[in-house]
A protein has these predicted regions:
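Helix-turn-helix
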Residues: 138
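Conserved G/P- and acidic residue-centered "switch" motifs that form tight phosphate/ATP-binding loops
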Residues: 106-108
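Acetyl-CoA-dependent GNAT
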Residues: 8-12, 19-95, 99-101, 112-113, ...
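Short amphipathic helical patch at the helix-1/turn junction of helix-turn-helix
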Residues: 98, 132-133
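Conserved active-site tyrosine of GNAT-family acetyltransferases
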Residues: 142, 147
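Conserved beta-strand edge residues that scaffold enzyme active sites
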Residues: 133-134, 156
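Extreme N-terminal starter segment of soluble prokaryotic enzymes
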Residues: 2-5
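Conserved GNAT acetyl-CoA-binding A-motif
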Residues: 119-132
Length: 160
């Protein structure tokens, strides 16, 4: 899969972001999270009105640096990420999801690099991520990129 690029999400991307996040949660956490916690997670993270509102928030607010989308050939969205710098010096990855057919092709890494660049621009010296489950399937991805456990569900890496 060839990655066309990473860009800031536009209003027309909201439905795709919502669907991709919900599908990723369902497929990644089946058998890890019980049905009710999974529904709550999807309801909290993937609600279309929430994502539409977040896309409309102008960039430049450190706590929320916006949604990014990765596109494949033809402009199809194949991955999404969101982050911010909620505490001075600490970047936070709020979401990162990649279409199953685009995984292991550098899409997640490209999204994380773009989000990290934004966070550095707002003074982040450390980057954190919190997982919905201790046995999160994304742990190897984050470990490969230099993250280490602060607690079973919270990981961090220095940004040098």
């Amino acid at each position: 899969m060839q990655l066309a690029g990473v860009r800031t999400a536009a209003a027309g991307d909201a439905t795709t972001i919502s669907r991709l996040l919900a599908d990723t949660i369902r497929s990644s956490y089946a058998g890890i999270l019980d049905e009710i916690p999974m529904r709550r997670l999807i309801s909290a993270q993937c609600a279309l009105p929430r994502i539409r509102a977040e896309i409309e928030i102008p960039g430049g607010a450190p706590g929320w640096l916006g949604w990014l989308v990765a596109t494949g050939p033809g402009g199809t969205v194949v991955g999404v990420a969101a982050g911010g710098v909620p505490v001075p010096g600490e970047g936070e990855v709020y979401a990162l999801a990649v279409e199953p057919g685009a995984r292991r092709a550098g899409v997640g890494t490209a999204l994380l690099v773009a989000a990290t660049d934004r966070m550095r621009g707002y003074g982040a010296r450390e980057q954190r991520v919190e997982f919905p489950a201790e046995a999160d399937p994304a742990l190897p991805f984050y470990a490969h990129l230099g993250f280490a456990a602060l607690s079973p569900r919270r990981w961090s890496r220095p940004l040098v």
